[in-house]
Amino acid sequence: MDPGIANHTLPEEFEEVVVPEMLEKEVGAKVDVKPTLTTSSPAPSYIELIDPGVHNIEIYAEMYNRPIYRVALFFSLFLIAYAYGLDGNIRYTFQAYATSSYSQHSLLSTVNCIKTVIAAVGQIFFARLSDIFGRFSIMIVSIIFYSMGTIIESQAVNITRFAVGGCFYQLGLTGIILILEVIASDFSNLNWRLLALFIPALPFIINTWISGNVTSAIDANWKWGIGMWAFILPLACIPLGICMLHMRYLARKHAKDRLKPEFEALNKLKWKSFCIDIAFWKLDIIGMLLITVFFGCVLVPFTLAGGLKEEWKTAHIIVPEVIGWVVVLPLYMLWEIKYSRHPLTPWDLIQDRGIFFALLIAFFINFNWYMQGDYMYTVLVVAVHESIKSATRITSLYSFVSVIVGTILGFILIKVRRTKPFIIFGISCWIVSFGLLVHYRGDSGAHSGIIGSLCLLGFGAGSFTYVTQASIQASAKTHARMAVVTSLYLATYNIGSAFGSSVSGAVWTNILPKEISKRISDPTLAAQAYGSPFTFITTYTWGTPERIALVMSYRYVQKILCIIGLVFCFPLLGCAFMLRNHKLTDSIALEGNDHLESKNTFEIEEKEESFLKNKFFTHFTSSKDRKD
C-alpha cells in the first residue's frame, strides 16, 4: 500500500461500510479485513501445497526462541563457517600451486569457471530440496559432496582430476553456504537479518591473519593443505547437528501434531510418481541440465582459447559456443516458459524490480571482484615481490574489512531499517577503489597502494553486498519464498563468478603470453614464465632482467582487468538506484509466515489495496469539495 495513504486514518463510516461490503462487490469474493482463500479457488495439488521443510523450520524456530538456544545455534553456524572459510583461504593459495605443478597455471580460471557453473545451479537445487526434505537432511548431503571433492582434489595427478574434485567440492560448499544462510534467515527477523547473515562471515576476521601462517607452515605441500579439510569440516558440523536434532526433539515433544513428515512424499506417493512429481517437476531437472550445459558451453571456451597458441578459430572452441547460444539457450527458454511447472527462474518473482535489480547487483558483485581478484595472489607474489604469508593476508583483506563493516552496519540497520542508501554508498566506494587499483597494479612500490585499495573495496562491500541480500529477502514478502529467492541471489552471484572468472581468464590467457614474448625473446623461457610462474621466480629472482620483464607483463594485464572492473561498476550503481527501499520489520518476512497463501490471495490483496486507494481518494476529494 502507498505510504502516503497508509499514514492517513480512514473515517469511521468508510471503514465500516467500504471494507466489508463494498469491497466484496469490487473484488467479487467474500473477503475479510485480512483476505483469505475463497472456496471457489482451485485446490492446490499435493506438490504445490506441501513444503514440509519450510513448515517444520517455523515450528523449530518457535521451540528455539530462548536466547541460550539461539546463541548455541548461531555459534554452531559460526564454527562451520570458520572451517570452510579458513579452508577457502588456504585452498585459494594451494590451487595456484596445484595448477602450476601440472605446468598449467593459466588453466586456473578454467577450473574456477567450471566450479562456479556447477555452484550456480546447485544453489537452486539445494534450496528446493531443503524446502521439501528439510535443512538438516540437505546439510548432510552437502557435507558428503564437500569431503568427497576434497579427497579427489588432494589426490589428483592431473588438471582433469583436479577439476572433477573441484566440482564436487564446490557443489558441497554451495549447499553448506546456502543452508547456513537460510537457517540464519529462518531464525531472524528482517531488521536483524543483516546481522544474522554476517554470523557465518565473522570467521574472516580471524582467518585473514592466521591463514598466512597456516599456508606457510604447510609450505608448498598443497596435497595435505587441501586434503586435511575432508575430515576437519565434518567435525566442525557436529554442533549444528546437535542443535538441529535437539530442536526436532523439542518440536516432537511439544508440537508433534503440527509437524509434517519431511519424507512424507516418499510414503504417500509411489516411487514412479515421486520421481515424476518431485525429482522431475519440482526440482526442474531438465531446466537445471540445460542451464548447466549452456553456461559450460559459453563460458569455459573463453578461458581455453588463448595461451601461447591461440585457438579461437579451432573447432573445439567455436562448436561449444554455437551449441550454447544457438541450441541450448533457446531450448532452456522454451522449456521454462512453456513446459516447466516449477521454473528455475519464477517469472512472477523476477518481475518485481526489487528482486530483478538485486539479482543484477549479485551478478556484478562477483563479476567485478574477479576482474581484480582472480589472479591477485599470483600478481602479488610474482610482480609485487610479496612472501607467501604476506600475499595470503593481503588477498584476505577484502573479506576482513567487509565483515567488520557489515557487522557494524547490521547493528545500525536494527534501528534504521532502510537498505538502499547504504547500497548506493558502498558501490560508490567500489568505483574509487577500482580507480586506485588501475594505478597500483604491480612492482614493489605498489605494496601500500594495493593494500589501501583492497581495504576500500572491502569497506564498500560491507556496505552493500549482504545488505542487498537482506533487501531481496524483504522483496520476497513470504517465508515460503525466502529460500528460493536466496538461492536465486546466490546462484546469480555464482554466475557472476563464472562470467568474471571466464573474462579474466580470457584476458589473461590471450594477452599475457604476447606481453611476455615481447619482453623475453627466448621462447622456451617465455613458455616457462607463462605456464609455471612460481617455479620461474625461484630461478630468476627479484631485480633480474627476466623477472623485470615478467613484472612489466603482469602490470599491463592487471591494468586491463582493473579497467574492465571499473567500467562495470557504473551499471552496478544504476541497479542500486532501481531497488526498492523496504522498511525492515520485526517479522521473518514482510507478510508473515503463512506459506500456504496462493496466488489468488495475493490477487485479492492487490485488488483490495487498489480499491481502498480509489475509494479513499474519492472520499477525500469529496470531503474537500464539501469544505470548499
UniProtKB/Swiss-Prot annotation:
Membrane topology: Multi-pass membrane protein
Family that this chain belongs to: Belongs to the major facilitator superfamily.
UniProt keyword terms in alphabetical order: Endosome, Ion transport, Iron, Iron transport, Membrane, Transmembrane, Transmembrane helix, Transport
Residue ranges the record marks as coiled coil: none
GO biological process: intracellular iron ion homeostasis; siderophore transport; transmembrane transport
Organism annotation: Saccharomyces cerevisiae (strain ATCC 204508 / S288c)
Name of this chain's protein: Siderophore iron transporter 1
The protein's role, per its UniProt record: Involved in the transport of siderophore ferrioxamine B and so has a role in iron homeostasis.
A molecular function GO annotation: siderophore uptake transmembrane transporter activity
GO cellular component terms, A-Z: cytoplasmic vesicle; endosome; endosome membrane; fungal-type vacuole; plasma membrane; vacuolar membrane
Subcellular location(s) per record: Endosome membrane
The keyword Transmembrane helix belongs to this UniProt entry's keyword annotation: yes
